[in-house]
Amino acid sequence: MTFNAFPPDPVNHLVAICATPRADCAAFTAVIAVPEQQRSPSQQGLNVLGQPLELCGCQPMTGWFRDGSCRTDPSDLGQHSVCCVVDERFLSYTRAQGNDLSSPAPAFGFPGLQPGDHWCVCATRWLEAYEDGMAPLVRLEACEQSTLRVIPLEVLRGHAAPGA
């Protein structure tokens, strides 16, 4: 069985270069513009607040399209639409569920997540963690609107990261 951590090649292209603000480095964001006529509605995207979707994180690069955004489309069967600020509890929880996000996977260019990293997670996994009392904080402005098909806005608001 072959594991592919990235979407199919036609969409596996870099459309954003950015850095997630961290205490140990200067923050910057530079986005390479894609002409509007080439962007689908899901690429333009709205967040759960009905505003333009913001970037989630780029160190490490997150998102189904590995562009820093928690946007999704029908090829993303897991619906990686929830922008989380991962913590040790969630990393331990998801590892126990069979998805080890904290261990590096060099073959896929994945450094492993550390507490404080921003990462797009599956809406159903986040909801499962919520139901088990293990859900991490979320950045509402970076959670794609499709998340609301799985998780009520009130629940997300209750786990909003400070400043969100």
Task: Spell out what each predicted region is.
Residues 86-100:
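Short, basic/aromatic beta-hairpin or loop at an interaction surface
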Residues 102-109:
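Short alpha-helix capping/helix-loop boundary micro-motifs
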